[in-house]
UniProtKB/Swiss-Prot annotation:
<keyword id="KW-0415">Karyogamy</keyword>
<dbReference type="InterPro" id="IPR007292">
    <property type="entry name" value="Nuclear_fusion_Kar5"/>
</dbReference>
<keyword id="KW-0812">Transmembrane</keyword>
<feature type="glycosylation site" description="N-linked (GlcNAc...) asparagine">
    <location>
        <position position="344"/>
    </location>
</feature>
<keyword id="KW-1133">Transmembrane helix</keyword>
<dbReference type="GO" id="GO:0048288">
    <property type="term" value="P:nuclear membrane fusion involved in karyogamy"/>
</dbReference>
<feature type="glycosylation site" description="N-linked (GlcNAc...) asparagine">
    <location>
        <position position="148"/>
    </location>
</feature>
<comment type="function">
    <text>Required for nuclear membrane fusion during karyogamy.</text>
</comment>
<keyword id="KW-0472">Membrane</keyword>
<keyword id="KW-0256">Endoplasmic reticulum</keyword>
<dbReference type="Pfam" id="PF04163">
    <property type="entry name" value="Tht1"/>
</dbReference>
<feature type="glycosylation site" description="N-linked (GlcNAc...) asparagine">
    <location>
        <position position="134"/>
    </location>
</feature>
<feature type="topological domain" description="Lumenal">
    <location>
        <begin position="16"/>
        <end position="423"/>
    </location>
</feature>
<feature type="glycosylation site" description="N-linked (GlcNAc...) asparagine">
    <location>
        <position position="370"/>
    </location>
</feature>
<comment type="similarity">
    <text>Belongs to the KAR5 family.</text>
</comment>
<dbReference type="GO" id="GO:0005789">
    <property type="term" value="C:endoplasmic reticulum membrane"/>
</dbReference>
<feature type="transmembrane region" description="Helical">
    <location>
        <begin position="451"/>
        <end position="471"/>
    </location>
</feature>
Amino acid sequence: MNIVLLIYCLAMVVAHDLQLFGDFKFELSDNWRNDCAKKALEPIINQCAEGIETISPFQQKSIAIQLSICEFENAEISYPSECRSQNLDTCILLLEKSPQYWTTFSGYYREIRNICHQVSLPFAKDQILQVYGNITEFYRTLMDEMTNSSKYTENMQNELKAKFDKLIGVIDLILADREKNREDLKSSFNMFKNNFEKSLNNALVVMKHSYEDANSNVKELESHLNYFINDMSQVYILINEKALEVKSQQDRIKEHNADILNQIEEIKKNLDNAYEEASEVQISNNQLVHDIQSSLDYSLFTVSNLNSHLQLSINDFIEKNEDIRSRAPIIFEEIFGLFLNHLNESGQLAMDSFEAALDLSLNMLHQKLNQTERSIDNLNSKVSDLAHFADSLKKYASSIFNVPNYVRTSMNHKIQQWREFGNIMVVGGVFFFVVLTLLVLSFIRTQVMKVFRFAFIGIPMITGIALAIFILRLLSMPMKVVDID
């Protein structure tokens, strides 16, 4: 702004000086422009300014003739008409015939260089004055334009000031209106916040009760599994005791029947193989129990994943609550609907994951039961083969070696015990397979929540009944001790 004002003041001063300078009149310059000699010397004025040595002899003769003509015309003396046609050679010949003409021509011819030097200074002055006059006119025009621009700028400033005053008034009205709307919006938002917090608290209470119910169901399932594991451990201990008792009786028979050791060596090997098969079956049962435990652990892990999904849903809901607080209350119904959909999707996802995990566990259990059933069938077939082999061997030994009656009685008793043990294993496996099949069919045909209730209550009850029947049958087996003394 300061620079603009400085330029404006400088232009004013220069314009004033030029206006004063334009009042002067240069009469000498006007006379010079109208002089015949000036017109004659115009072709060489520029050369005179650069240097007189640049003037050629032809130019010197032409300028001398033109100056002579000017002098003749000023003195009103007639001269040859050929000199007007710019025929220099003819004109010079005609001027040579008259002493007066020749003296004038020769004088100008000799003084051309001096005249050129004298005339160049007024001509330069005239050029300077002309340029300065043009500059004066330019600055005068510029001054007028700047004056008009200053007036236009002042008018624009006044108009802008009036418009800004009106705009400031409108802005004040808008701000007052917005302040009033802000108070109304604040009260509406507080009301929305209170209602939303109440709804959120109710939803959290419902989710907490659901989580507690699921936790109680998991604990009940854990107690039933512990009961099932304890029963299986007792069965395993009884089987080991029976196996040890059988082995001790075999050792006593071996000690008191040294005479028939070679004949029953093959029977002993077969009994050892049968014992190994029973051990393998026991190991397979233990592996089955371990797989069941793993499946149950996986189910617990799935339940924990369900809990984590619910927790993530709660966290996501809290984040959305923070986002909702910054919005208008008109979107409350849409947000609540989206929240319910999200909870339903999360619950459905968790239920699908739990169903998939339970299906996988049941499939694995079904495979293990099939393997156990095949092992029991193999063991039953081997026990049957062993029984037939023992019967044939007994007959052969009785007919050849006349085996004592107490030995035959002991052998028959042991064979009968192994046969009954194999039958019990087969019946128990078939019963367990039937129960599992019914459970799978009920799981397919009923709703998921009903199956869960049946699984929490029915499976442990059926398993306990089956184990009780198995243990009663095992304990009811006749275990006679043969006195061989």
